[in-house]
Design a protein with these regions (language model features):
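A short, well-ordered alpha-helix in the C-terminal region of glycosyltransferases
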Residues: 335, 342, 349-363, 372-375
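A conserved mid-protein helix/loop that constitutes part of the nucleotide-sugar donor-binding site
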Residues: 17-22, 206, 210-232, 246-253, ...
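Conserved acidic donor-binding segment of nucleotide-sugar-dependent glycosyltransferases
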Residues: 320-322, 326-333, 342-347, 362
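N-terminal strand-loop element at the rim of the active site
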Residues: 7-13, 26, 30-89
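Carbohydrate-associated surface elements
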Residues: 170, 192
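Short hydrophobic beta-strand element within catalytic cores of glycosyltransferases
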Residues: 305-309
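Basic, ligand-binding patches in group-transfer machinery
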Residues: 383-645
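Aromatic "clamp/platform" in nucleotide-sugar-dependent glycosyltransferases that forms part
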Residues: 269, 288
Length: 645
């Protein structure tokens, strides 16, 4: 069969795109020809990797580099869509020009099966796809989300489809009940999630992980409040939230207001995410509604028990409460905190639930879900008496994925394993190149071979895309007191290139806490490294643009810790009124500038956007100034002083 998927944008990030790619790849594995038509192209490359066997067709190119529309096309692009229902949330993004491009594609589509992936596109398929095609409408949300007006439009349109699929059985029941004329054509097929190639979490890390769009419906505010309740009893535990969205700023403000900035990190978007799930011991989901729960299955597949609200629709269908995780009433912060607390205090229960969760996640593999879709498509083709669909591709004719993405694994704090032959790999920094050592088809690089700074991983002399970066071993790196450095692999934001950040020194001042006490900023931390000097330490704040301007800080040290206090009212703007950037240092020698105070001993190579601190408005030099502590690009702690708005 030839199968075509019609999607809103392959170039965004989200569950619909990810599961469409998973299913498309599984169908290609079965020997079918697969293409994905994306209405919009908003960036150069998709955020998720696309199997080279899958053809991508772009209908509307909205990149800044795309040729400008002219004439009739430009006039149509300025008019709102007539094809896409106004009650569909994506309607404002569509135009008459997009309508024309969609209709043109559908009328010329030579596939055996065409699959829509959201209501507006399903309506377009029902109205304009050729009569001989098998037409499938996927529902990745749920019927109750659409409202009565859109529901009526869908009922009329969906009579022209051969099948409608939902990602939850509850939603399938809703369609059958409220759209009785198409009840026989409604099928429940869950989303697909590939099994991770990484070893599962050992659930001993003191980390809770949540992931998904940072939107109101995800109720991350409830998660923060529940974590705050648990954190008072278990201050060694941390929370990481992965994703981005419109509520990111609001969530940061809530974290700061709860005084959790040292324990809660907003990590941004990571792809693939399984290398992050394995760093946790508990997964948390606090949504009001989940049509499916892609992140739940991802976490389960990595061996994490999942604490989730029992919200409609997906979580109660996926999680067997007490076996693979725990379900709590939606909106009940105390119940959620109790569930977290129970797993935090019982490692054996975490381990048992994690193992059961990992086994249950096998239900959702792309091979299994792809086979369900293939069976549905074939049954609908047979019903149309179109049994001669051409020979399936044999295994030998299938394209194989290029070796573009490179996986890596942090063996420990100082050793990195690269998944490739050593004779093809190297690491480059400026004019310096280091060749890794090889063993059993893998390559190894060590801290002793690398200078401090950023290294680019090369394959055959060219930068390589990061695959799975399994750096979970680094999440416990701070416990080492005799280290001389750390090797942190990461994907470069924007390009996805595999980079390695190295910190290498005789000793380190590693930040553990930053807190405000009126106008004084207190920074505490650990002193690490075999070259740690003896004697009395002095902390300083130095103006970056004028190193002669130095403020001495109140400083205390003991055998392995330090504390400095900054009188922020003494800090000023830079000369000329620009932002004053003050770098914090610690020195045991009055004749030496010492070392920067920072935080480098974990898996976060770029901490500036993941670890934020509260800011303060005070008075310095007779004017209102905003004082903001932050981690600079090198993960060293600085203070930014600007004029208050």
């Amino acid at each position: 069969m030839k199968i075509s998927f019609l999607v809103h944008s392959l170039y965004n990030i989200g569950g619909t795109i990810k599961t469409t790619l998973n299913t498309a790849e599984a169908l290609a594995d079965l020997g079918h020809e697969v293409e994905i038509a994306t209405v919009f192209r908003r960036r150069e490359e998709p955020l998720f990797s696309v199997d080279p066997r899958i053809k991508v067709v772009v209908l509307v190119d909205t990149r800044k580099t795309a040729p400008a529309l002219t004439g009739t096309d430009a006039r149509l692009a300025a008019k709102p869509s007539r094809l896409f229902p106004k009650t569909e949330p994506r309607h404002p993004q569509y135009s008459r020009y997009a309508d024309e491009r969609i209709i043109e594609y559908l009328r010329g589509c030579d596939a055996d099966v065409i699959v829509g992936t959201r209501p507006g596109l399903n309506i377009a398929i029902a109205a304009h796809a050729p009569a001989g095609l098998v037409k499938i409408g996927q529902e990745h949300l749920f019927l109750d989300r659409h409202g009565r007006r859109l529901e009526r439009k869908l009922y009329r349109a969906y009579r022209g489809l051969d099948a409608v699929t939902t990602v939850s059985s509850t939603d399938a029941d809703s369609y059958r009940k409220r759209m009785p004329r198409i009840a026989a054509n409604v099928h429940f097929i869950p989303n697909s999630i590939p099994a991770t190639s990484l070893p599962p979490s050992d659930v001993t890390a003191r980390t809770i992980i949540a992931a998904g769009r940072i939107e109101k419906i995800k109720r991350y505010d409830l998660l923060i409040d529940a974590f705050a309740m648990v954190h008072t009893e278990h201050p060694e535990w941390t929370l990481r939230i992965y994703g981005h969205g419109r509520e990111t700023k609001t969530l940061r403000t809530l974290v700061e207001g709860r005084g959790l900035h040292d324990s809660v990190q907003l990590m941004g978007t990571y792809t693939p995410i399984d290398a992050e799930w394995v760093k946790g011991s508990i997964a948390a989901v606090t949504s009001e509604i989940e049509s499916f729960g892609l992140t739940i299955v991802e976490a389960m597949g990595c061996g994490l028990p999942v604490v989730s609200t029992a919200c409609p629709y997906g979580p109660p269908e996926i999680i067997d409460s007490g076996v693979t995780g725990l379900l709590t009433p939606p909106g009940d912060v105390e119940a959620f905190a109790k569930a977290l607390r129970g797993l935090i205090e019982n490692e054996e229960q975490r381990r048992a639930m994690g193992a059961a969760a990992r086994e249950h996640a096998k239900r959702y593999t792309p091979a299994r879900i792809g086979a369900e879709y293939a069976a549905l498509f074939e049954s609908r083709l047979s019903a149309r008496e179109r049994t001669d669909t051409g020979p399936a591709l044999d295994a030998a004719s299938r394209a194989t994925s290029p070796d573009s993405a490179l996986d890596c694994h942090s063996v420990d704090m100082s050793t990195l394993r690269l998944a490739g032959p050593a004779d093809r790999l190297s690491l480059a920094q400026a004019e310096t190149t280091v060749t890794p050592t090889g063993a059993d088809g893998a390559a190894f690089v060590n801290l002793d071979d690398l200078d401090e700074g950023v290294w680019t991983v090369l394959r055959d002399g060219a930068p390589v895309t990061a695959g799975r970066v399994d750096s979970r071993a680094l999440t416990r790196a701070g416990a080492r007191a005799d280290t001389t450095g750390i090797v942190v692999p990461y994907a470069e934001p924007g390009t996805g290139a595999l980079l390695v950040r190295v910190w290498r020194r005789d000793w380190f001042a590693e930040v553990t806490s930053v807190s405000w006490h009126e106008a004084r900023l207190r920074v505490t931390g650990r002193l690490l490294g075999p070259g740690l000097p003896k004697g009395t330490a002095t902390g300083t704040a130095t103006l970056r643009t004028d190193p002669s301007r130095v403020h001495a800080l109140t400083t205390t040290t003991d055998d392995d810790g330090f504390s400095v206090e900054v009188d922020t009212d003494a800090l000023t703007l830079a000369d000329g009124g620009g932002a004053g950037l003050w770098d914090l240092r610690l020195s045991f020698d009055p004749e030496s500038a010492g070392i920067r105070v920072g935080k480098v001993f974990d898996d976060v190579a770029l901490r500036k956007n993941t670890h934020r601190f509260p800011e303060r408005v005070g008075v310095g030099s007779g004017r209102a100034l905003r004082v903001k502590p932050y981690f600079a690009i090198d993960n060293q702690l600085s203070i930014k002083v600007t004029e208050a708005d």
